[in-house]
Amino acid sequence: EVGKKYFEVLIDEMKNKKGVTQDVELTAEDLQELAEQFKAEYKKQIGVDFPTDPKEQLMGAIEAVFRSWDNPRANVYRRDNDIPYSWGTAVNVQAMAFGNMGDDCGTGVAFTRDPSTGAKGLFGEFLTNAQGEDVVAGVRTPMHISEMEQKFPEAFAQFKTVCKTLEDHYRDMQDMEFTVEHGKLYMLQTRNGKRTAQAALKIACDLVDEGMRTEEEAVAMIDPRNLDTLLHPQFDATALKAATPMGKGLGASPGAACGKIVFTADDATAWAEKGEKVVLVRLETSPEDITGMKAAEGILTVRGGMTSHAAVVARGMGTCCVSGCSDINMDEDNKVFTLAGKEFHEGDPISIDGSTGNIYDGIIPTVPASIAGEFGRIMTWADKYRTLKVRTNADTPEDAKRAKELGAEGIGLCRTEHMFFEESRIAAFREMICADTVEEREKALDKIMPYQQGDFEALYEALEGNPVTIRFLDPPLHEF
């Protein structure tokens, strides 16, 4: 196959030659010249002439779709979405509808509900005299779908009717592509639309209220992986739409955080005590950083993966964390780092998304998590129909109290070594680990026993009679 990049180079050269910036500004003669260049490039790369028989071209296109099932991107997508490899793919062969044959033509992409908020109503974009690729590629600025009504009133009225028919049939929010050719509407495809976690909850509840889904079906519509993000602060959906990530790491602990950059745990603690919201930026974290990690709104590390110290501790504390952003060039001594060609100093504002791993310049407003509204309704329905009890991992009285508030019916695992991460306790714990004699070890144990006894008592009180499974000390030595 010939990669798309070879043809893009030829298109860019032609646009530069003609002094235009958009593909649609090229004339028919320009496109004919480009077609000859494309054929020459194809022969250069493949070694044979480009086939001119339409049937041969069609079969080549079909085979290309089948081959795409094995490309790296498809394999990653299947793995992330639990799609079996054995399914294979299908090819639809259909007559073409042209949206680029003049000003009475156009193309668009639309959702029957807002995929960010879940609000009912048409949401999408439309372009006149264009093909579908132009809408999603960003080469031209599209119009809001509502503006289609002024340009093509009859097609728009028909489109609204079709949207309702499709949503009523599939009983879910639809993501549709369509073309208008000389004023006539052609529907190209529809599918259940992707949506944010918040939108998923609203859509599921609204479909129940509209009589299209049962409560049990609404619960089944929610991807459980999305719920984790809803238990942490989130970026305001409207503000997030306007923001562009400047970097990306691993989404190690969900939630959203924004604040002023600090580079040491001590600074994080000191700034937080003054009422400042801070994001702790480190090459990597260690147990000595625990007080600063607790004081910070979020944690960003250059090194480390999903099981690094920063990731594990942040998840345990419910703190937003992005780890392993190797694009950051860090200078800890001078308290500065470089990302996306810009220098960031102590005190500069930054925002991080622990669910996606995205990093943003500046402050993006956040909204707190709560089991209320649609989230509360969905969880109430889940409780109504579930057959399993749910327990949680909790290692401290604070964790247990929060878990109980969020509906946990006990603790499935309490990792007792996590009780000793605090600065006031970790020294005694290290004494116990490093003791050379039994006497020294028992002396250290005498120091830590009151901490543990107090925590156990507080754990039991927080759980109000619910069960707890205690794991005796099992400390990974590198964490202490």
Model-identified regions with their sequence ranges:
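Nucleotide/phosphate-binding sheet-loop regions of phosphoryl- and nucleotidyl-transfer enzymes
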Residues: 1-240, 276-279, 286-288, 297, ...
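Short, hinge-like loop/turn segments at secondary-structure boundaries
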Residues: 338-341, 368-369, 428-432
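Protease-associated
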Residues: 212-295, 358-363, 375, 379-383, ...
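Short, surface-exposed secondary-structure edge patches
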Residues: 112, 269-271, 290, 339-343
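C-terminal domain-closing interface element
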Residues: 183, 188-190, 345-393, 399
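Short alpha-helix capping/helix-loop boundary micro-motifs
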Residues: 165, 334-340
